[in-house]
Protein backbone atom coordinates (compact mmCIF):
# COMPACT_ATOMS: atom_id res chain seq x y z
CA UNK A 1 0.00 0.00 0.00
CA UNK A 2 1.37 3.39 -0.99
CA UNK A 3 1.90 5.78 1.91
CA UNK A 4 2.36 9.52 2.17
CA UNK A 5 5.74 9.82 3.86
CA UNK A 6 7.50 12.93 5.12
CA UNK A 7 11.29 12.80 5.42
CA UNK A 8 12.73 15.25 7.94
CA UNK A 9 16.29 15.99 6.86
CA UNK A 10 17.82 16.30 3.42
CA UNK A 11 21.39 15.25 4.09
CA UNK A 12 22.99 12.21 2.48
CA UNK A 13 20.96 9.70 4.50
CA UNK A 14 17.64 11.54 4.34
CA UNK A 15 17.94 12.05 0.58
CA UNK A 16 18.87 8.39 0.10
CA UNK A 17 15.91 7.18 2.14
CA UNK A 18 13.57 9.50 0.26
CA UNK A 19 14.79 8.02 -3.01
CA UNK A 20 14.36 4.44 -1.80
CA UNK A 21 10.86 5.11 -0.52
CA UNK A 22 9.88 6.82 -3.77
CA UNK A 23 11.15 3.84 -5.73
CA UNK A 24 8.97 1.68 -3.48
CA UNK A 25 5.90 3.49 -4.77
CA UNK A 26 5.29 5.85 -1.85
CA UNK A 27 4.45 9.54 -2.09
CA UNK A 28 7.44 11.21 -0.47
CA UNK A 29 8.06 14.80 0.55
CA UNK A 30 11.43 15.81 1.95
CA UNK A 31 12.17 18.78 4.20
CA UNK A 32 15.65 20.28 4.19
CA UNK A 33 16.95 22.79 6.69
CA UNK A 34 17.30 25.48 4.03
CA UNK A 35 13.56 25.21 3.31
CA UNK A 36 12.81 26.96 6.61
CA UNK A 37 10.15 26.27 9.28
CA UNK A 38 7.16 27.39 7.20
CA UNK A 39 7.86 24.76 4.52
CA UNK A 40 7.76 22.11 7.24
CA UNK A 41 3.96 22.40 7.33
CA UNK A 42 3.80 20.70 3.93
CA UNK A 43 4.67 17.45 5.71
CA UNK A 44 1.93 17.77 8.34
CA UNK A 45 -0.42 15.46 6.42
CA UNK A 46 2.15 12.64 6.14
CA UNK A 47 0.98 9.24 7.37
CA UNK A 48 4.52 8.32 8.44
CA UNK A 49 7.45 10.58 9.27
CA UNK A 50 11.09 9.61 8.84
CA UNK A 51 13.48 11.45 11.16
CA UNK A 52 16.79 11.72 9.32
CA UNK A 53 18.27 14.96 10.64
CA UNK A 54 21.70 15.05 12.24
CA UNK A 55 21.31 14.20 15.90
CA UNK A 56 22.06 17.75 16.99
CA UNK A 57 18.91 18.86 15.15
CA UNK A 58 16.49 16.25 16.49
CA UNK A 59 15.38 18.07 19.63
CA UNK A 60 14.64 21.31 17.80
CA UNK A 61 12.80 19.46 15.04
CA UNK A 62 10.70 17.56 17.58
CA UNK A 63 9.66 20.82 19.20
CA UNK A 64 8.48 22.16 15.84
CA UNK A 65 6.17 19.23 15.06
CA UNK A 66 4.95 18.20 18.52
CA UNK A 67 1.62 19.92 17.93
CA UNK A 68 0.80 17.71 14.94
CA UNK A 69 -1.51 14.72 15.29
CA UNK A 70 0.23 11.53 16.35
CA UNK A 71 1.55 9.20 13.65
CA UNK A 72 4.48 6.75 13.44
CA UNK A 73 7.95 8.24 13.22
CA UNK A 74 10.90 6.21 12.01
CA UNK A 75 13.99 7.49 13.83
CA UNK A 76 17.14 7.16 11.70
CA UNK A 77 19.59 9.52 13.44
CA UNK A 78 22.63 7.74 14.90
CA UNK A 79 24.40 9.17 17.91
CA UNK A 80 23.88 10.50 21.40
CA UNK A 81 22.86 14.02 22.27
CA UNK A 82 26.01 15.62 23.75
CA UNK A 83 24.10 17.69 26.30
CA UNK A 84 21.79 14.98 27.66
CA UNK A 85 23.32 11.69 26.49
CA UNK A 86 19.93 10.68 25.08
CA UNK A 87 19.28 8.78 21.87
CA UNK A 88 17.27 10.28 19.02
CA UNK A 89 14.17 8.20 19.80
CA UNK A 90 14.24 9.41 23.41
CA UNK A 91 14.27 12.99 22.16
CA UNK A 92 11.32 12.31 19.86
CA UNK A 93 9.38 10.63 22.66
CA UNK A 94 10.06 13.46 25.10
CA UNK A 95 8.50 15.99 22.73
CA UNK A 96 5.84 13.73 21.17
CA UNK A 97 4.91 11.20 23.89
CA UNK A 98 1.83 9.87 22.07
CA UNK A 99 3.66 9.13 18.83
CA UNK A 100 4.78 5.55 18.13
CA UNK A 101 8.54 5.67 17.50
CA UNK A 102 10.53 2.93 15.78
CA UNK A 103 14.26 2.85 15.10
CA UNK A 104 15.87 2.17 11.72
CA UNK A 105 19.55 1.21 11.85
CA UNK A 106 22.03 -1.01 10.06
CA UNK A 107 24.99 -1.16 7.65
CA UNK A 108 23.69 1.46 5.24
CA UNK A 109 26.36 3.54 3.51
CA UNK A 110 24.30 6.13 1.65
CA UNK A 111 26.50 6.35 -1.43
CA UNK A 112 26.24 2.60 -2.08
CA UNK A 113 22.45 2.70 -1.83
CA UNK A 114 22.40 5.67 -4.20
CA UNK A 115 24.24 3.50 -6.73
CA UNK A 116 21.47 0.91 -6.53
CA UNK A 117 23.52 -1.58 -4.50
CA UNK A 118 21.63 -3.88 -2.09
CA UNK A 119 21.52 -3.48 1.68
CA UNK A 120 19.62 -4.66 4.74
CA UNK A 121 18.64 -2.86 7.91
CA UNK A 122 16.68 -3.31 11.14
CA UNK A 123 13.40 -1.79 12.27
CA UNK A 124 13.24 -1.94 16.06
CA UNK A 125 10.39 -1.18 18.43
CA UNK A 126 8.00 -2.64 21.00
CA UNK A 127 4.80 -2.68 18.91
CA UNK A 128 5.11 -5.90 16.93
CA UNK A 129 2.04 -5.13 14.85
CA UNK A 130 3.36 -1.73 13.78
CA UNK A 131 6.83 -3.14 13.13
CA UNK A 132 5.46 -5.90 10.93
CA UNK A 133 3.30 -3.46 8.98
CA UNK A 134 6.14 -0.99 8.41
CA UNK A 135 8.50 -3.80 7.50
CA UNK A 136 6.16 -4.90 4.73
CA UNK A 137 5.43 -1.37 3.56
CA UNK A 138 8.97 0.05 3.55
CA UNK A 139 11.04 -2.91 2.32
CA UNK A 140 12.06 -2.92 -1.35
CA UNK A 141 13.95 -5.32 -3.60
CA UNK A 142 17.09 -3.27 -2.95
CA UNK A 143 16.53 -2.47 0.74
CA UNK A 144 15.53 -5.43 2.92
CA UNK A 145 14.22 -4.76 6.42
CA UNK A 146 14.34 -7.11 9.40
CA UNK A 147 12.75 -6.33 12.76
CA UNK A 148 13.59 -6.76 16.44
CA UNK A 149 12.13 -5.69 19.79
CA UNK A 150 15.24 -4.03 21.22
CA UNK A 151 15.06 -0.42 20.03
CA UNK A 152 17.40 0.83 22.75
CA UNK A 153 20.10 -1.71 21.95
CA UNK A 154 19.66 -1.12 18.23
CA UNK A 155 20.01 2.62 18.65
CA UNK A 156 22.97 2.42 21.03
CA UNK A 157 24.79 0.04 18.69
CA UNK A 158 24.33 2.48 15.82
CA UNK A 159 25.70 5.32 17.93
CA UNK A 160 28.65 3.45 19.42
CA UNK A 161 29.93 2.01 16.16
CA UNK A 162 30.63 5.57 14.97
CA UNK A 163 33.16 5.98 17.77
CA UNK A 164 34.76 2.66 16.88
CA UNK A 165 34.88 3.65 13.21
CA UNK A 166 36.94 6.71 14.17
CA UNK A 167 39.34 4.41 16.04
CA UNK A 168 39.50 2.05 13.05
CA UNK A 169 40.32 4.94 10.74
CA UNK A 170 43.16 5.95 13.03
CA UNK A 171 44.41 2.36 13.11
CA UNK A 172 44.41 2.08 9.32
CA UNK A 173 45.83 5.57 8.90
CA UNK A 174 48.81 4.53 11.01
CA UNK A 175 49.17 1.46 8.74
CA UNK A 176 49.11 -0.95 11.67
CA UNK A 177 47.90 -3.87 9.56
CA UNK A 178 45.06 -6.37 9.43
CA UNK A 179 45.93 -8.03 12.74
CA UNK A 180 45.67 -4.75 14.61
CA UNK A 181 42.41 -3.81 12.89
CA UNK A 182 40.85 -7.20 13.68
CA UNK A 183 41.96 -6.95 17.31
CA UNK A 184 40.61 -3.41 17.58
CA UNK A 185 37.19 -4.26 16.14
CA UNK A 186 36.86 -7.35 18.32
CA UNK A 187 37.61 -5.37 21.45
CA UNK A 188 35.34 -2.60 20.16
CA UNK A 189 32.45 -5.05 20.10
CA UNK A 190 33.18 -6.00 23.72
CA UNK A 191 33.27 -2.32 24.69
CA UNK A 192 29.95 -1.72 22.95
CA UNK A 193 28.50 -4.66 24.90
CA UNK A 194 29.57 -3.02 28.17
CA UNK A 195 27.60 0.11 27.32
CA UNK A 196 24.54 -1.76 26.05
CA UNK A 197 24.40 -3.88 29.18
CA UNK A 198 24.84 -0.85 31.42
CA UNK A 199 22.07 1.13 29.74
CA UNK A 200 19.53 -1.67 29.38
CA UNK A 201 19.99 -2.81 25.79
CA UNK A 202 20.33 -6.47 24.85
CA UNK A 203 23.85 -7.65 24.11
CA UNK A 204 22.65 -10.13 21.48
CA UNK A 205 21.57 -7.14 19.38
CA UNK A 206 25.26 -6.53 18.76
CA UNK A 207 25.49 -9.74 16.75
CA UNK A 208 22.97 -8.59 14.16
CA UNK A 209 22.80 -5.94 11.46
CA UNK A 210 22.59 -3.02 13.89
CA UNK A 211 25.73 -4.12 15.72
CA UNK A 212 28.47 -6.05 14.00
CA UNK A 213 26.88 -5.43 10.59
CA UNK A 214 26.99 -1.66 10.94
CA UNK A 215 30.40 -1.80 12.63
CA UNK A 216 31.97 -3.76 9.77
CA UNK A 217 30.58 -1.42 7.12
CA UNK A 218 31.42 1.81 8.92
CA UNK A 219 34.80 0.85 10.36
CA UNK A 220 36.31 -0.51 7.15
CA UNK A 221 35.11 1.78 4.36
CA UNK A 222 36.42 5.17 3.20
CA UNK A 223 32.78 5.92 2.32
CA UNK A 224 32.20 6.28 6.08
CA UNK A 225 32.62 9.82 7.41
CA UNK A 226 33.71 8.57 10.83
CA UNK A 227 36.35 6.29 9.31
CA UNK A 228 37.64 9.14 7.10
CA UNK A 229 37.78 11.40 10.13
CA UNK A 230 40.00 8.82 11.85
CA UNK A 231 42.27 8.66 8.81
CA UNK A 232 42.63 12.44 8.98
CA UNK A 233 43.52 12.30 12.68
CA UNK A 234 46.18 9.68 11.93
CA UNK A 235 47.63 12.04 9.31
CA UNK A 236 48.26 14.59 12.06
CA UNK A 237 45.26 16.85 11.59
CA UNK A 238 43.63 18.19 14.72
CA UNK A 239 39.92 17.80 15.42
CA UNK A 240 38.76 20.94 13.62
CA UNK A 241 41.01 20.37 10.62
CA UNK A 242 39.79 16.78 10.30
CA UNK A 243 36.14 17.87 10.50
CA UNK A 244 36.73 20.48 7.80
CA UNK A 245 38.43 17.95 5.54
CA UNK A 246 35.57 15.46 5.90
CA UNK A 247 33.16 18.31 5.20
CA UNK A 248 30.10 16.63 6.69
CA UNK A 249 28.60 15.65 10.04
CA UNK A 250 30.79 13.20 11.98
CA UNK A 251 28.45 11.81 14.63
CA UNK A 252 31.23 9.81 16.28
CA UNK A 253 32.78 12.99 17.69
CA UNK A 254 29.97 14.20 20.01
CA UNK A 255 28.95 10.60 20.71
CA UNK A 256 32.47 9.75 21.87
CA UNK A 257 32.46 12.65 24.29
CA UNK A 258 29.04 11.69 25.65
CA UNK A 259 29.98 8.01 26.11
CA UNK A 260 33.38 8.78 27.63
CA UNK A 261 31.74 11.09 30.17
CA UNK A 262 29.09 8.50 30.99
CA UNK A 263 31.71 5.77 31.28
CA UNK A 264 33.66 7.78 33.84
CA UNK A 265 30.49 8.38 35.88
CA UNK A 266 29.57 4.69 35.78
CA UNK A 267 33.19 3.52 36.18
CA UNK A 268 32.98 1.38 33.05
CA UNK A 269 36.13 0.15 31.34
CA UNK A 270 36.00 1.81 27.91
CA UNK A 271 39.64 2.07 26.81
CA UNK A 272 39.00 2.62 23.09
CA UNK A 273 36.38 5.30 23.69
CA UNK A 274 38.58 6.98 26.29
CA UNK A 275 41.59 7.00 23.97
CA UNK A 276 39.58 8.53 21.13
CA UNK A 277 38.17 11.14 23.53
CA UNK A 278 41.68 12.13 24.61
CA UNK A 279 42.72 12.35 20.97
CA UNK A 280 39.80 14.66 20.25
CA UNK A 281 40.85 16.87 23.15
CA UNK A 282 44.41 17.02 21.83
CA UNK A 283 45.69 15.37 25.01
CA UNK A 284 47.19 12.40 23.11
CA UNK A 285 48.72 11.85 19.69
CA UNK A 286 47.56 8.82 17.66
CA UNK A 287 50.83 7.04 18.45
CA UNK A 288 50.45 7.76 22.17
CA UNK A 289 46.88 6.46 22.11
CA UNK A 290 48.09 3.21 20.56
CA UNK A 291 50.81 2.89 23.17
CA UNK A 292 48.27 3.49 25.94
CA UNK A 293 46.03 0.70 24.63
CA UNK A 294 48.90 -1.77 24.23
CA UNK A 295 50.23 -1.13 27.73
CA UNK A 296 46.97 -1.86 29.53
CA UNK A 297 47.04 -4.47 32.28
CA UNK A 298 47.06 -8.04 30.97
CA UNK A 299 43.89 -9.98 31.83
CA UNK A 300 41.48 -12.66 30.64
CA UNK A 301 39.58 -12.00 27.44
Curated annotation (Swiss-Prot):
Task: Name the InterPro entries for this protein.
Answer: 6-PGluconate_DH-like_C_sf, 6PGD_dom2, G3P_DH_NAD-dep, G3P_DH_NAD-dep_C, G3P_DH_NAD-dep_N, NAD(P)-bd_dom_sf
Q: Specify where it is mainly localized.
A: cytoplasm
Pathway(s) it belongs to: Membrane lipid metabolism; glycerophospholipid metabolism
Q: E.C. number, please?
A: 1.1.1.94
Residues bound to NADPH are 13, 33, 78, 110, 225, 251
Molecular function terms, GO-annotated: glycerol-3-phosphate dehydrogenase [NAD(P)+] activity; NAD binding
Q: What is this protein called?
A: Glycerol-3-phosphate dehydrogenase [NAD(P)+]
* UniProt organism field: Synechococcus sp. (strain RCC307)
Amino acid sequence: MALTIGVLGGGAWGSTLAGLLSQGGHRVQIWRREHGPQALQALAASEVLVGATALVGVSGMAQQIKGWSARPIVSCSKGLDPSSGQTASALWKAACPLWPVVVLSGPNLASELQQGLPAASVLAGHDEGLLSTLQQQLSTEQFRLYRNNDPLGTELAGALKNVMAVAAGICDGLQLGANARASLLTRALAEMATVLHGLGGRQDTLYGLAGIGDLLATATSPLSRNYRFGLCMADGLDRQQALEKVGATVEGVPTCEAIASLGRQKQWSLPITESVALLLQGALSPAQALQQLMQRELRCE
